[in-house]
Amino acid sequence: MAANRHGGHLPLPEGLAAPTHRTVIYYAKCDFSPSEERCVNRFTGRPGPLTLMRDRSNVEHMVLITVKTDEEDRNTAEQNQARARSRSQETKKILTLLAPQIDYNPLTLDSLDHNLGQRAVIFSYGPNLHQRLTTSALELQRACKTLKLHSILRIESGRHFTSKAVQYVVENEDDILTAALIGENNLYQINTETLSATRLVTDALSWAEYKPLDVTCNAVMKPPREGVQPMCLVASSPVSDYNFNKYLMITPSCTAISLHMGHPYPRVSQGIFHVHSSTRTMGRQCCDYLFHSSLLPNGNTTAFACGYYVTSTTGSGSIPTSVNEQILHAASAQGRSLNNLGVPVVSGFLKPLPRCSEVPNNVITHVSQLRTASERDLNLCRVRAGQFVAAVGAYDPTSGPDKSPYLYRDSIDSLNRAIQATKLFYQMCETPCVSSYQREFGSCSTLHHLLALVSPKGMTVHISRLPEEITKALRSVPVLEEDTVCAFVSGYFFNCFSSQLFLVIDDKVKTTPSGQIHFTDILKKAGNLCGAPVYILGRTCNDIGIHCVNDLYHPRDLSVLDSQATSSMTLTVQPHASVVSATLQPQEPHEEDESIDWAMFGTSSTISNILSHPAVASKSNIIRRLDRCGNGLIAQQPGIGPSDAPVSDYAIICDSSMFPARLENDAQSIKKISKQEAQRAYAQIHKWFGTEKLFLNTISAKVIALGEQAYKLSRNPIVGVKYAIAEAITNIMFGPDCVLEDITLTVAAHWNKQETAALYRVLFACKEMCRELNVNLSITDASDSRDTPIQDTDAANTVVVTASARVTSIERITPALKKAENALVHVCLSKELTLSGSVFENSFTAFSSHLPDLDTSKLRDMFYAVKHLISKNLVVAGHDISDGGLITTAAEMCFASTFGVTVNLPSALPALMYLVSETPGALLEVPKEHLSTVTTLLSERGLTWYAVGTVNNVKNLSIYDNGTHLLTESINILNSKWMSYAEESFETCEPHIESMYRNDYGNNAMDLKHLEDLCTHKPLQLYTCPSHPVSVAVLTFPGCPDPVATLQAFANVGFLSYPISTEFLLQGNNLNAFSCLAVSGSSAFEEEGTGTRIAIYTLLQCDLAKNCLKEFFQRPDTLSLCCGELGTQLLAACQVVGDTHPSRGDISSNPESWTLELEPNASKHYESLWLNFHVPQTTKSIILQALRGTIFQDGLWQVLGLRYKHDAQEYIMQQNGTIAMSYHSAKINPYLYAMHYPRNPSGNSSVAGICSKNGRHLALLVEPALSFHTWQWQHIPKPLVTSPWALMYQCMFLWCVKE
């Protein structure tokens, strides 16, 4: 579906044929996947057409390597032998690099199926080998070209399931296994017996028919005709300044921090920020990121919020196992793709839509993204005809939406390289030289994006300048008709989607000391440095449309304008007939006046069912599989409290993690230090601390919050969207101080294209409410739902609202309860209890009740009343009331803390109805001595409020109605109900893990020993050394996210932080100017472990780079802090850490000689967890010397373990003091190392950090830069002013100055 191969009417199969090749299959042992385990359990010992014998089932990894072969009659025997040896060596190299993908198990050419006999059950499956390469295979293919492994054409992964049946093989055995093992996933059976003789596809080409633009998007986001404003502009409502670029953009000011390669970090400037939101059926992961980047070019996206709707659910909202897998695959593909761009996911939701039509693979995704840009980087040059049109990045086309398990997702490695190349190009040009970056809305074809790029003009495209894959296929056929060429180019280029970046470049030149250089040549140079292909497609012109010039066999010189060039094909967007009709009016909401017999519902069972409903239950199964704060800018992430409960109402994203004093170069806060003073300070830790408060309430940040009410929208769209706005407002209400005028609401709609008239009314309802609230409103996206007939009222119509605001403080209120005996106050917009569209109504009733309208003035009054109470410290905790009602809000506040609550229900209201009502409002924790003050103020504002109970310290939830006891339940039991969806998801969709320890997470104790008083009461002292400035080289790898957090952490303590590309080392430069080397992060490959090995292998293959690193490590005045996958693997590969045997001399690029390997975590997935760490008292590490003996926590992203190459390697390191850090239990006993997942991510070695034998070089699996400040911590067990992690960097600065 995502990779159709060929247009049937084109006579060109030979042009797409791969070189002569053969495919070899390698097998390696592995564990059962969840679907394989279910298959074995289902068919083992069970009567039916297929019965498997007990304990005879196995599964293996398959690595399928397609290798180029030669036609033997054209070569001599010696040549054939030499080439065979070369192919064998190249295959061996790539298999070594693929080791993490197969869990380091040995590969063999023989499967385990050879001794199963006549009743053998054999089923191999994987990607479709007759379509374009999967994303993982494409990344590996490009890596092979870089490494000059020329014989390797394609590398794919598959699974080989074997068993033995009780009966002889039945005819439909393959159909049975296909349904059990593949299901609705985009996988195919592979015939391993005939594969070696089968010709496979070995290129990236994909065929697509022309597809018009999204109808709903056209109707809302684009002008219906010339001279008429688009609906998105008409329905928007600005309060503050705005501009118009595709739609109305509210762009508040902020501080912009930028990275310039080879220059000290950071560069600070005045900037703007903007939030773009979109909701669409799961398709391309980065299409909206690319669109937003075109609005704010050269900027930085700093946060994403992701939500998911699923329509294939039961009436109660429960999610079948197969659909659950699709959700997790979608969330992983979407979230991890965004994470690999270097951006965390900070908020989200999951909502099953049980009353919608069930469509397989119909996961609807919402993405809101926050992006900042420097105002000076937004300047464009003038638009003129004759400018160059460029495409930057690898051409990885897809022909349509992908589906689970998303094998054809966007290659983030390629996209990162393209982004890095365009930013480097802009920096190298030093003047505005781009006139357009524009893209079309949504997941569109290349044709639509190019037309948007040059609008309102046109462009010529020279076929000879298209990506190499296309021109090579065309040139392989001697004679082609003009129509065939045009059809080929349309199907394989213009009609496909690609994540390339498009830009229009000025046709002028830049004057340099060495002469004049064209801007296009600068772009090509930037592309070469970053590993991103650059295609100069053609030039702009005044004639509307895309005009193709067939110069395939006689390429034209684009530097010379050729007015004689004739077009062989002109492409434009085909017009649409409007679907909006005056006779098509939205249906009135269907309401049934039926009363509920509340006596039928038990309080305990109802609460349990609501807490376990997927819309309400914990989403930790999704949230903990995504990076939540990997750029170091997140002051409030989803997890709250000691148990990391994902209940936060909002997220806070700081402009920078730099101390304001550093950004402003404040001489009063920064103390100058000499080499001699540094020597004294290094030995006296108390001098590392000062008295100047470094973070006042003036830190610049943004706060964002989501609002969505799909259930209520299905009852009454006009009123339901107001509830979504109310949820966004009540969520952001608990964040840092702001006023309504500062808030911008961005709205994204996903709507049935047959009901656009109803969507118009919904958008105008948004506008009316926002005007009454006096908040900014911007409509940023609209898209079609799956095709449904007009009479089908079960279409998934949704509107998601994202609230954002700039704030000057990170002080806020969270749902975590603070103190026993504090009062609980329920404040709401109305005395009317809202059941329509509630989780209760969806779960327990078969009818729809009336959805009451909202009083906007009451919402405004409640917002300001709560803000006032918070500012006076009269409210110490709070949580909005939304899905699940008051009882869910109270329970979640308990889950986020160590307290319980006692609820005393108002006497005039039905007890259970009151508990499950979803009338917008909030539950406030108020110090008991201030209760009367709070309630008086709420009454004066005309708000409805109820004093509903108190906080208790017995960890129970007790409910009383008029003094009658209704329920007392342990918080732990309620939490297990709330966690049930996540647990069920884990059990059905994850590999086998010891369930006994799976929930041993959170509640980390901390023991700072001698540092406790200092870290609790004193801030870090900021130093600078003008006489001996010290510099750190922060190494960046092509295709990997920029190490922003690491750069900022080093700059915070006084280093001159330089981002240095690996190209700097590959070109033979040295590191003599640097006292410290830092590496962090991981590869952006889909298979991150393999990508990391390839990145290190590529670097160390170069003798110049190896010698540079060796010289640096051998200098006595250097330190290294290498973190995460890339850092740890680099130090191990250079034999700096982990080498317990006599040194073997030179650094080797061969992975088999590396001293350590990285082991994936036990869940086999990326995870973001907050774990405890222990620094041994005996460690030799200089960097950690101040922290010896301490136990404290940090966030761990892409949790890993270490795999040793030699016996007793860990014991020897323990004895020689080179173990620097270990995973630890929740307790402060120094001997209680973490032995099991998740506290020990791999479940094997507990070692999390290793230093060199001289103590100067440190490899950590953790990223300490993400916890440099206490505000970056998910939870602080004790009040801290200074993070212990900051002392590492302070120690390094003082050591480097004194040395």
Swiss-Prot record:
Entry annotated with the keyword Membrane: no
TM regions (residue ranges): none
Subcellular compartments: Virion tegument
Matching InterPro entries: Class_I_gatase-like (IPR029062), FGAR-AT_PurM_N-like (IPR055181), Herpes_virus_tegument (IPR010077), PurM-like_C_dom (IPR010918), PurM-like_C_sf (IPR036676), PurM-like_N_sf (IPR036921), Tegument_herpes_virus_N (IPR024346)
GO cellular component term of the entry, any: viral tegument
One GO-annotated biological process of the protein: intracellular transport of virus
Keyword Endoplasmic reticulum: no
Gene3D superfamilies associated with the record: 3.40.50.880, PurM-like C-terminal domain, PurM-like, N-terminal domain
Keywords: Virion, Virion tegument
Pfam families: AIRS_C (PF02769), FGAR-AT_PurM_N-like (PF22689), GATase_5 (PF13507), Tegument_dsDNA (PF12818)
Molecular function terms, GO-annotated: phosphoribosylformylglycinamidine synthase activity
Stated name of the protein: Probable membrane antigen 75
Organism: Saimiriine herpesvirus 2 (strain 11)
Source organism phylogeny: Viruses, Duplodnaviria, Heunggongvirae, Peploviricota, Herviviricetes
